[in-house]
């Protein structure tokens, strides 16, 4: 974070805590139970960086593109929906437009539905929200929350305060790259917009996932001049230790929280007996991007 070291950026603890407090006091689990969402330390770090690091010159948030790569079953859908809820209800942008984007409309349903379940579970949020046929509308702030599918030819009309891109590894080739460009180019009218991209690793090469990985890696190594991208890449360091639970905690920060250790032990044994299952385990639970024939038995 060279901007913090150089003094170009500030960390506003009050703004960071405001976002954390909203999520933990208004956002409920959407599956299995109705408890309030309790953020883990890694999630608090992400929320704090997004909403707490400010451009000292403008006073606005520093980061516009956030890229989170975390293994399957670590609660990323609900986490993304909770961040979107903060943007829709608390961020203070009148007339905000929040989009949940995926290649197909039914794929965008996952985070969109999690968002609406958060709203329904809280009487205060629900009382100022109307579910319409094409969107979720918050009259008090003139805010629209909508799910949309790929249409890279249509760029007019998008004026997003926030875009949530789910499972970026499934965004195919040029189509995914073009759609991402459409949404990023539409950010200009907002003072502090946010594109949140969440994913596990995948099998597709040369798509937007790979492009974001290249940019993110360069940023984290200090080799990039970019100042608006904020990556969080949770993956194992040692592929030879892929079956070690301590190593797996690096790609599964919620190990033992949202999923038990026993689940991973069972999946490891299945992977040891099947090359195809090992490839799937390495990509989806270790976040190592591989071709199908890459790993050795």
Describe the residue ranges of each PLM region:
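Phosphate/NTP-binding elements of NTP-utilizing enzymes
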Residues: 1-294
């Amino acid at each position: 974070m060279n901007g913090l070291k150089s003094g170009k950026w500030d960390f506003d603890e009050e703004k960071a805590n405001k976002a954390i407090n909203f999520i933990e006091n208004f956002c409920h689990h959407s599956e299995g139970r109705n408890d309030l969402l309790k953020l883990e330390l890694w999630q608090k770090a992400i929320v704090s960086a997004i909403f707490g690091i400010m451009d000292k010159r403008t006073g606005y948030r520093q980061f516009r593109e956030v890229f989170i790569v975390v293994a399957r079953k670590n609660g990323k859908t609900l986490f993304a929906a909770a961040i979107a809820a903060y943007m829709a209800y608390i961020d203070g942008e009148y007339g905000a437009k929040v989009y949940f984007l995926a290649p197909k409309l039914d794929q965008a349903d996952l985070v969109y539905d999690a968002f609406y379940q958060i709203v329904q579970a809280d009487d205060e949020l629900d009382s100022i929200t109307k579910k319409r046929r094409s969107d979720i509308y918050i009259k008090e702030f003139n805010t629209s929350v909508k799910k949309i599918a790929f249409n890279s030819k249509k760029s007019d009309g998008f004026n997003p305060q926030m875009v949530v891109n789910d499972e970026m590894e499934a965004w195919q080739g040029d189509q995914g790259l073009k759609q991402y460009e459409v949404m990023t180019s539409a950010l200009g009218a907002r003072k502090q917009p946010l594109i949140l991209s969440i994913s596990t690793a995948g099998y597709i090469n040369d798509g937007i996932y790979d492009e974001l990985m290249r940019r993110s890696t360069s940023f984290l190594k200090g080799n990039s001049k970019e100042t608006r991208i904020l990556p969080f890449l949770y993956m194992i360091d040692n592929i030879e230790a892929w079956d070690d639970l301590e190593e797996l905690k690096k790609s599964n920060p919620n190990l033992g929280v949202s999923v038990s250790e026993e689940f991973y032990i069972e999946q490891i044994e299945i992977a040891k007996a099947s090359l195809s299952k090992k490839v799937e385990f390495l990509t989806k639970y270790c976040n190592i991007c591989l071709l199908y024939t890459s790993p050795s038995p």
